[in-house]
Amino acid sequence: IKIDQGERVFIEGKNGSGKTTLIRILSGLLQSSEGAFYINDDTFRKINLKQYRSQIGNIIHSETPFEGTILDNIIFNNTDCSDEDLKWALDGVQLTPYIKSLPKGLETQIFPEGQQLSSSNAQKILLARSIINKPKVLFYEDPTDAMDEKVANEIIDFITSDINKWTIIVSSKNPYWKTKCNRFLTMEKGQIISDIKK
């Protein structure tokens, strides 16, 4: 599989077909046991993982915010993050109204696993974190599935806008993602059985 910069790739298949494994290998969370994986013509085994991960944003299935402030969760130790970048990310994922409703705003403490957050707001925090550094590649597993359809689709429009030059690799139950992608991979038993470009 070769994915070009700027492609928006939708991965589909039944449960257990290998979607999650493929996304986690491509995002550097898993090492493949066989085969080779190249990034910009360098084999993955030669890649500086820390540098690679600094250029990607990802949300894995069932991920939750960690204990700490909302701000900590979004900037994730990135002291270079500007106020403009923060506002852009919060507005883009429609988190600003929620933040403004909180007495402590971004300094609001999140309990372990984001227990006091709605599932929708928890996903918005993860989405803001994934884009705030304006990464080159986004890897998403069910990133908007806890949101109502209207809000989810508006956020998908923002994420997939042509203004954003990142590559997107996504697996989701929300069919709207598929309409915004230009390449479609179908997985079955750990194999890519179909690869269609729009």
What residue ranges belong to the model's regions?
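Conserved ABC transporter NBD signature motif
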Residues: 35-44, 52
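Catalytic Walker B motif of ABC-type/P-loop ATPase nucleotide-binding domains
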Residues: 138-142
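The feature captures the beta-strand-to-loop junction immediately N-terminal to the Walker
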Residues: 12-14
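Helix-to-loop junction immediately C-terminal to a conserved catalytic motif
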Residues: 27
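Conserved "ABC signature" C-loop
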Residues: 63-109
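ABC-fold ATPase nucleotide-binding domain signature/coupling loops
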Residues: 96-125, 143, 190
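Conserved catalytic loops of ABC-family nucleotide-binding domains
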Residues: 158-172, 178
